[in-house]
Amino acid sequence: MRIGLFTDTYFPQVSGVATSIRTLKTQLEKMGHSVFIFTTTDRDVDRYEDWQIVRIPSVPFFAFKDRRVAYRGFSKALEIAKQYKLDIIHTQTEFSLGLLGIAIARELKIPVVHTYHTQYEDYVRYIAKGMVIRPSMVKYIVRGFMSDLDGVICPSEIVYDLLLKYKVAAEKRVIPTGIELEKFQRPEITEEDVSDLRAKLGISSDETMLLSLSRVSYEKNIQAVMAALPSVLEEEDKVRLVVAGDGPYLPDLKSQAKKLGIEDKVVFTGMIAPGETALYYKAADFFISASTSETQGLTYLEALASGTPIIAHGNLYLDNVITDQMFGTLYYHDNDLAGAI
């Protein structure tokens, strides 16, 4: 088949959605399909770098400056879609490219399916401080977007149950997003490599390294991990938290570390190169996440594939992943986080 993936976010933007789309593209191509990505322009990449990636003129989304939305070039996108003779369109966003994908599918009279990635109730706070779109309005917006789809892919049971609650009528199926295991197993990474990274981070061999790796934003709830750290340090002083990643909430976390008096126990690395991700996982004793906004959470799978157990806020998805203590520890209330660590 000739498949068009429509998304507002793709590399070089870093996100779980971008990663899942690249994985999907790679695996579909291995099966013999032709895959074309329709996405937004990005100042860090040549618009015409790859003929299979169609970049539509875009501007930063006012509520998420590191995310973009298309604003013109729609007729050109339709023309290109006709030239590529698409058999099916798979949308990955509810915004500009998602709406464009549905419109093009109807114009070409081909099926359109959609993957629902995001619990928007956790994100509407970014739009005019939650004064324009309230959490209670999300279900109506999503239901309207999905009213004319041929099918919806749910990455987890969490999403499936959420769409049932929204009363989305379209046919739904749970299809988890996989990861490319070889990118994280990495047998060529040696103990010396791990020791060198820990030394670079200022973490000794007898210290426990907790790794948080994600976009640094409010909904990732890294602040809960920071808040739990003083209680942990009262019981065990040799614990260090590494916050790997960048994002709008980074200054707040640095300020929080200072207020809590744990600046010497927290390492902020900023953005790390994708090729170093597995090394960071392997250098850590535990991957930690207090996020309650994940619909699936690829970083959990990446950590486990790297051989690193996780400490995370439990949910329906993780309850089916962490089935043995060797894989990690789940907790269900923020006041239980310190005990879980």
Task: Give the residues covered by each predicted segment.
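N-terminal subdomain of nucleotide-sugar transferases
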Residues: 1-55, 81
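Donor nucleotide-sugar binding/catalytic pocket of nucleotide-sugar-dependent glycosyltransferases
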Residues: 39, 54-57, 135, 140-193
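Short alpha-helical donor nucleotide-sugar binding micro-motif in glycosyltransferases
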Residues: 81, 146, 271-272, 279-284
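Conserved donor-binding/catalytic core segment of Leloir-type glycosyltransferases
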Residues: 198, 204-220, 226-229, 242
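Nucleotide-activated donor-binding/catalytic signature segment of Leloir-type glycosyltransferases, i.e.
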Residues: 251-272
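Aromatic "clamp/platform" in nucleotide-sugar-dependent glycosyltransferases that forms part
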Residues: 292
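Short hydrophobic beta-strand element within catalytic cores of glycosyltransferases
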Residues: 309-312
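Conserved acidic donor-binding segment of nucleotide-sugar-dependent glycosyltransferases
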Residues: 324-335
